A protein has these predicted regions:
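Conserved beta-strand/short-helix segments
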Residues: 1-167
């Protein structure tokens, strides 16, 4: 059993509780990779309270533990931030990913606005049994209420995605 907490690298003074670390989360298991001998697994953890409710997503990869041979450790490999960050936007309020972890939808829902959902595509590079993960913003969805305003529609308060990420 592993306990996962946000890194304490000095990048923030926010505690895990203040970050709302774990507010949203998703595990993806893409299958056997040609560059590794075991099935890859990814864990995405939302922290919408990070840095005065700016928010961010932590990505972890299931990997080899201290003994050097057993896969038993989640290791942080990336943080994902909004393309339009700002205090109070709460990026990471909800998140959803397809089964492979290649497509990620992340909502920002701050009080009094319509909210938005940012869609990211993984653009990782693999070589020599090592992978550098990256995500690129491909689309931003916003909510509009029936009266045409963008107030209080709570767009992105709930997310779902198909296994392949096309819907």
């Amino acid at each position: 059993l592993n306990t996962i907490t946000p890194p304490e690298d000095g990048s923030t003074t926010d505690s895990a509780q203040a970050q709302n670390f774990g507010w949203s989360h998703k595990i993806c298991e893409p299958g056997v990779s040609s560059t590794r001998s075991t099935t890859a697994k990814y864990l995405f953890v939302g922290a919408p309270g990070y840095e005065s409710d700016t928010g961010q997503i932590y990505m972890y990869e299931w990997g080899i533990g201290a003994d050097g041979s057993t896969y038993d450790t989640w290791t942080e490999c990336l943080t994902i931030t909004s393309a339009d960050p700002g205090q109070g936007k709460r990026f990471g309020h909800r998140l959803q990913a397809n089964d492979t972890g290649n497509i990620l939808a992340v909502s920002s829902v701050s009080p009094g606005n319509a909210g938005k959902v940012e869609i990211f595509r993984r653009t990782s590079q693999s070589n020599d049994d090592s992978t550098q993960h990256a995500f690129t913003l491909v689309q931003t969805l916003t909510g509009i209420s029936t009266d045409g305003s963008s107030l209080n529609t709570a767009f992105g308060d709930s997310l779902t995605m198909s296994k392949d990420g096309t819907t």
